Amino acid sequence: MNEESTKSLKDSLFTALNLFNNHEWYEAHDAFEEIWNSVDGDERQVIQGILQVSVSQFHLSKGNLNGATILLGEGLGRIKTRTKIDLGIDLVSFCQCLEELLSKLQYNELLNENDKPFLKPL
């Protein structure tokens, strides 16, 4: 990847992260999808996992608990074995957050604002 495309990827990730962290799930999905189309290998798998988490949150916001739980689990599965991939995101803390949220969803526990996933930049 040349310097220009690396800068473009970082800019795109910054935009996508902000959308995600502002709970703009649909827009974050679109932003991460653009990134997903430009990467491959493990990076692509991580981005796909984040995409799935974003869609899971969209489902959750619409009251679709089953869809949210399934997509959250699939997204977590894609990311948790690839936490060493350097995308400028703290994937370890992200996975911990997702595991806690998944457990609450699976056990039908009450959720609060602090349960929404957050992508922490490194």
Language model features: what each stretch is:
Residues T6, R44-V46, S93:
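Residue signature of alpha-solenoid helical repeat architecture, marking inter-repeat boundaries
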Residues L65-T83:
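TPR/TPR-like (Sel1-like) alpha-helical repeat modules
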Residues Q96-L122:
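Terminal, low-structured helical/coil segments at or just beyond the last alpha-helical repeat
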Residues I50-V53, K84-L105:
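TPR/TPR-like alpha-solenoid helical repeat scaffolds
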